[in-house]
Each structure stands twice: as structure tokens, then as C-alpha cells.
Amino acid sequence: MNTQSIGAKGKSKAAKGIAKRHRKQSSLSDSISKPAIRRIARRAGVRRVGGGCFKEINNAAREYIRDTLSIACIYATHAKRKTITCSDILHSLKRMGIKYIGY
């Protein structure tokens, strides 16, 4: 006997009770993933990344982004805008002492 009714889309009735597999949730939902950190490290020339480094890299990246965005927000509010533009980010990086060429 056919478990799937005629014209029905999706899975059969027999497969409805099967548990679905879920990805493991990380403790920091807004953190950078380990593979992403490895890719960035590879671009910088690093061959291996120690296990204890990931948390520190996440903290440093979060602080760097927070500082950059807070300065960019100051530029946007001074210009009476609610949207942060690319030039706001470039000015905030310049204020932090980082020269970014290409934009």
C-alpha cells in the first residue's frame, strides 16, 4: 500500500515521526565561527591556530567592530543621518589610525 496520498507534496506519512537533525548551537550566537577564523588566519600566513585562541580572537574582533561602529555612528549623527555609510566607516578607521586604501 502507498503511504503517500495522491497529489500530496512533501514526505510520506511514514516519515513524519522521524526526528530531524539540528546543528550544535554555540554559546556565543553572535561570534565568528572557527572555520571563518581559520580562513582569516590563512590569509595572514598562519598555518595552525591553537584551540584557546578562538575566544580571544572573538573578543578582539567584537571590541574592534564596536569601536569602529561607535565612531561611525558619531559621524552619521553629526550629518543628521540614521544610516551609516561607507565613508563613515572609512573616516572612523582613519580616526583610529588605520589607513584603508581602495574606497
UniProtKB/Swiss-Prot annotation:
The keyword Cytoplasm does not apply. Keywords: Acetylation, Chromosome, DNA-binding, Methylation, Nucleosome core, Nucleus. Residues 20-24 bind DNA. Residues 1-32 are annotated as: Disordered. GO terms for molecular function: DNA binding; protein heterodimerization activity; structural constituent of chromatin. The modification N6-acetyl-N6-methyllysine is found at K16. One of its GO terms (cellular component) is nucleosome. The modification N6-glutaryllysine is found at K94. It is found in: Nucleus; Chromosome. InterPro entries: CBFA_NFYB_domain, Histone-fold, Histone_H4. Residues 10-25 have a biased composition (Basic residues). The keyword Nucleus applies. Glutarylation at Lys-94 (H4K91glu) destabilizes nucleosomes by promoting dissociation of the H2A-H2B dimers from nucleosomes. The modification N6-methyllysine is found at K16. Belongs to the histone H4 family. Core component of nucleosome. Nucleosomes wrap and compact DNA into chromatin, limiting DNA accessibility to the cellular machineries which require DNA as a template. Histones thereby play a central role in transcription regulation, DNA repair, DNA replication and chromosomal stability. DNA accessibility is regulated via a complex set of post-translational modifications of histones, also called histone code, and nucleosome remodeling. The nucleosome is a histone octamer containing two molecules each of H2A, H2B, H3 and H4 assembled in one H3-H4 heterotetramer and two H2A-H2B heterodimers. The octamer wraps approximately 147 bp of DNA. This is Histone H4. The lineage of its organism: Eukaryota, Fungi, Fungi incertae sedis, Microsporidia, Unikaryonidae.
